Amino acid sequence: MLKPLFWPNLAWLGLLAALPAGAQDLSFTLTIRDHRFDPQELSVPAGKKFKLVVKNLDATAEEFESHDLKREKVIPGNSEGTLILGPLKAGTYSFVGEFHEKTAKGSIIAK
């Protein structure tokens, strides 16, 4: 016969297994519209790994590029891309849309 504490523990493990991978991770979204990033400044917690979803609402592709973060990713028009960033030290990290650098620019501020 199984001990009474076995079933609650088994149920708890089942709930943990049902969570999607990375459900505990932080997630932030940048939107590209009219060749501009929104928001232009994104605040994130320093010292934490996070997911950055870049949604491109324009019909043309844009390249998210950051020399500070050592990341670049082409986001096709009307689609989205995901980058895993961090953990970052406190500071400001600039990024641009390489295909429209005059208008598509911003920064991630780790606090």
Regions found by a protein language model. Give the residues of each.
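N-terminal edge beta-strand
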Residues: 24-47
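Bacterial N-terminal signal peptides that target proteins for export
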Residues: 1-11
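Beta-strand-rich interaction surfaces with strong enrichment in secreted/lumenal proteins
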Residues: 40-42, 70-74
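Short beta-strand/loop motifs in extracellular/secreted proteins, especially
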Residues: 50, 60-62, 104-106
